Amino acid sequence: MLLSSKNDPKLYDNFEEIGLKSAIKNNDVLIKINLGAYQKNHPRTDMTLLKKVVAYIYNHGGKCAITEGCSGFLTENLITFGFEDILKQYNIKVIDVDLEECDEVISYGEYHYIPKCFQEYPVRIAIPATSKSNDMLYSNNIKLFFGAVPRKMYQLDDSDIPIGVPRPKLHQNLHLSVANLFLAIKSYSEFQYYINGGLAYNENIGEFILSDTFVGNNALELDLYMFHNFFSNCEFPNYLDILKTRTETVLAVDRSVP
């Protein structure tokens, strides 16, 4: 399911239609965002949208934590981008995945390390920064999870990967690792809700604001929609083709089972 809205009342109607409203009542909610330290032309989750989602959760009987991998600086980064009042108002838990213990999950032969705390939250929401920056892959819901695993588990002793890449092991076979990591998290602690809106970045036009907010339950469907509607002048990422093929294979197998 993929729904869009141009205003808050319709957005909240869409939350209800995808099942978010009923899911959050009396539940703990985990929100995965994209928020590194400030860099020019560096994508980040739209803070206005994030504030709306947090307020919606608490107004409907839930409570939440926010997570991202920031080498211990997630709270500081949130404050830098104007989120301090919300953190205090709701006493939100901040989880920097780089400091968390993890479980090993094998996905298509690749070893991945998923934070154990993810399973403590029955409801999981992804709010990425929709972007395609120079010399980087198109990034939205699926690639968001590159920042959902501890950096210490993805280092290499000797690497040709450029200095500054936080998880070099993931870059040895980049597109395959994007797909495998997404499926590892899906099997261990699936994120059921995806919200795309607000600030976005396209290498050909720079920063822009999405006129609609898009919500859904299927990360691949939403990634494909956002790419074809807002990034068709950019390079299409192979990891989406990998996931499309795997999804089609699973569906074909399911249909063949009596």
Model-derived regions: residue spans:
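Extended, low-polarity segments enriched in aliphatic/aromatic residues
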Residues: 1-30, 36-258
